[in-house]
Every structure is written in C-alpha cells, then in structure tokens.
C-alpha cells in the first residue's frame, strides 16, 4: 500500500527520523539543495511506514535527489537488483525501503503461484442445501475450485457460519484431510475455535462433521509457523507446512512480513483461506495485505464478499450509521462530519411515513378534537369509531 504525505514542520517529525535521514545523507554535500530534499523525502517515507504503508508515492525528481541511495526496480523482470540499495523506486512512482520491496516481491510471487495452481475439484452437488445465501454459496464454490480464497464481509454476514460448512464439505470429501486453523492473536484464535464448535453443532452438518473435526485446534499464526523469540519461522519454502487446508481468521491483521512468512510456507496442492473484514481490525506493522489483495482485479475469482448482515434488521439506523462511517471521506473535518451525519442519517429518519389501520384516522381525530366540541358532535365521532368494532360486538352478543 502506498500513500502521499505532505511536507510537515520539523517540529512534527520524530527526532529519530530526523537523525536517520541525516545519517543516510551524511556523504552528500550539506550545502546542496538536493541534500535537504533527500532528507525530506526519507522523512516522508518513514512517516508513511509509521502509518502502516509499505511505500510512498513520490515524483521522479524526489527519487533522483536520493542519488546513490536509490535504484530503479526492473519493470520487466521479477529479478532483484544486482546490488542492494537502501531504497527502491519502481515504475509506479512508489518509493520503498529495500526490505519492504523485497517482501512484496516474494508475496506477489506466491500469490501468482497459488493463482495458477491446479487444485483437486470438489463436487458440490449433494451439498447444495447447506447454504441459501447466494454469496455464501459462491464462497463454497470458490474454495472447491481454487487454491487461494479470500472471504470478506462485515459483522453478522456469516463468515464463520459459511466457513463451518466449507470445512465440513472438505472433510467429507477427504476424511484424512489435514486442516490448520489459525489467527494472528491468541484471543482471535480462541474466538475462532468457540464459534466453529458452535457451528459444527448444527444438525444440518451432523452427517459431515467427524469427532476429529469437532476437536479441531486453533493456533496463533506465530505458533503455526513455529516462530520463536528471534521471529524466524521454522516452516518456510524449503520446509513447508504439512497441511492440505490452511484457514486464517481475522486476516485483516496480517502485516506484510507475517503474510510473506505464511505464504512462504504454503505447500503445493494446499488450499489457503483468508477470512476477515478489512474495515475492522488493521495490522499493527507495515502493510494491510487483505485490503490490498481484495482490490486486485486479477484475483476477482479468488474473492467473495458476503453482503447480507443479520446482526441487525434491514434498514436499522445502526446499520445505516455503520455504512455511512465506512463511506466517509477521511479528509472531512470532524465538524463537517457531524453536519453531514445529521443531514444524511438523523434528519432523514425523523419524519417517517406511517401507514394507518382503517380505524386509526378516527382515533387520531378524537385525540385532536377541540375542547369546545359539543356533546352531540363528540357522540357522532364515538359512534363512527364504534362502527369499526361492530363485528366484535355482534359476536359477543351471540
């Protein structure tokens, strides 16, 4: 993910960033204007990294100011530069630290590998009844035919419900299937386990869920990869994970390095399912992998976004507010947002058309009768109101 950072006052830049930019340019002529521009560009890149972006969009002139510190990424080959430079400038005008550029290249190669990989197809004819929602059905179809699957959706759209049925179908197709389920944090892994166990108890899955599947463990991603205190995974490209299916919940929390380590360890003929909502939990470190992957056109067949939320009623104000916040332009000021919210959500829901029952107009008229109405006029209204209940009176009389 790239970003554009406007120049900031030096008072707003952390001291360590200032010091590092000066250290990187210590061999430059301190009197030359390009030296200051180079330092400013480095500072902007560091600020962008702090915000979770892996690169910064800059002009060719800004990149040129970095002189011997930067090299141009090869636009026609996937090969890495012959020599290692601190910074990489690619054909999309994005400036990287070499480390994050190299991680993105590795991850991209694994995505291409999985996209092109032929996987054993699963016949879903006998499982058509398991899911009714067309998007959930599409998710099952995708996993049955693709090695890489991205299942996204907001709260209450049935991600875990759908996953339970997907896993049950895969388990029925291959009773000896080896499944790994993990999440970036221990808390997320525990929630995943509890939610799946509840879903596996559905009577509709009774014939598909085995005792082994009911006892399926969930791990943290670090434990799955065998990462110790030195953050070096025990499983990698030369020693891949021993699983046929790998499921990662809360995948929005995957940063660039962790995602690359994960995909390094995905073996051939393995299905990997990323489950999450990019609008919710974000990664702590650099890179928002799930959000970036779901916007790649070439992966359209590898992604299903669940649409229908069952957490609140259709048209509920809380749902409208959530969608409004997600669509809000991040550049809008707080005061503008409040005014816009009042216009779009609050005022729009104050006046609602009310459909009255047949007898309600008479009730309303009685409530708003003038105080000086005569007894005769009031009696006429009462008789008119009673007509609506004549059938009930007759039945009681009988």
Label for each model-derived stretch:
Residues 162, 166:
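Hydrophobic positions on the alpha1 helix immediately C-terminal to the Walker A/P-loop
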Residues 279, 283-398:
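Conserved helicase motor core of P-loop NTPases
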Residues 159:
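Conserved lysine of the Walker
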Residues 130-145:
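N-terminal pre-P-loop "Q-motif" helix
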Residues 62-122:
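Interdomain "pre-motor" coupling segment immediately N-terminal to P-loop NTPase/helicase cores
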């Amino acid at each position: 993910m790239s970003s554009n950072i406007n120049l900031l006052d030096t008072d707003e830049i952390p001291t360590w960033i200032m010091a590092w930019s000066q250290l990187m340019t210590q061999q430059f002529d301190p009197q030359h204007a390009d030296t200051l521009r180079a330092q400013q560009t480095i500072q902007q890149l560091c600020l962008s990294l702090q915000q979770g972006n892996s690169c910064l969009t800059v002009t060719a002139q800004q990149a040129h100011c970095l002189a011997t510190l930067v090299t141009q990424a090869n636009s026609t080959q996937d090969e890495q530069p012959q020599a290692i430079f601190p910074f990489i400038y690619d054909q999309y005008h994005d400036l990287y630290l070499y480390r994050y550029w190299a991680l993105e290249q590795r991850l991209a190669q694994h995505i291409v590998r999985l996209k092109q990989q032929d996987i054993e197809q699963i016949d879903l004819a006998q499982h058509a009844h398991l899911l009714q929602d067309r998007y959930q059905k599409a998710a099952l179809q995708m996993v049955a035919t693709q090695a890489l699957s991205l299942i996204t959706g907001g709260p209450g759209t049935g991600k875990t419900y759908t996953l339970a049925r997907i896993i049950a179908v895969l388990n029925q197709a291959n009773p000896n299937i080896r499944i790994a389920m993990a999440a970036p944090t221990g808390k997320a892994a525990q929630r995943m386990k509890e939610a799946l166990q509840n879903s596996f108890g559905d009577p509709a899955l009774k014939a598909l869920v085995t005792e082994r599947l009911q006892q399926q463990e969930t791990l943290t991603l670090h434990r799955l990869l065998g990462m110790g205190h030195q953050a070096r995974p025990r499983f990698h490209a030369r020693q891949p994970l021993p699983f046929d299916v790998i499921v990662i919940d809360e995948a929005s929390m995957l940063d660039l390095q962790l995602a690359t380590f994960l995909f390094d360890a995905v073996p051939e003929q393995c299905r990997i399912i990323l489950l999450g909502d990019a609008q919710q939990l974000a990664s702590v470190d650099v890179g928002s992998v799930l959000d970036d992957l779901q916007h790649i056109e070439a992966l359209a067949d590898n992604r299903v976004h669940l649409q229908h939320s069952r957490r609140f009623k259709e048209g509920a104000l809380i749902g409208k507010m959530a969608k409004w916040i997600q669509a809000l332009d991040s550049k809008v000021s707080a005061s503008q947002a409040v005014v816009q919210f009042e216009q779009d959500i609050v005022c729009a829901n104050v006046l609602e058309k009310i459909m009255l029952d047949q007898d309600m107009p008479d009730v309303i008229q009685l409530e708003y009768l003038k105080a000086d109405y005569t007894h005769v006029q009031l009696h006429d209204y009462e008789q008119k109101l009673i007509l609506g209940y004549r059938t009930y009176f007759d039945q009681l009389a009988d």
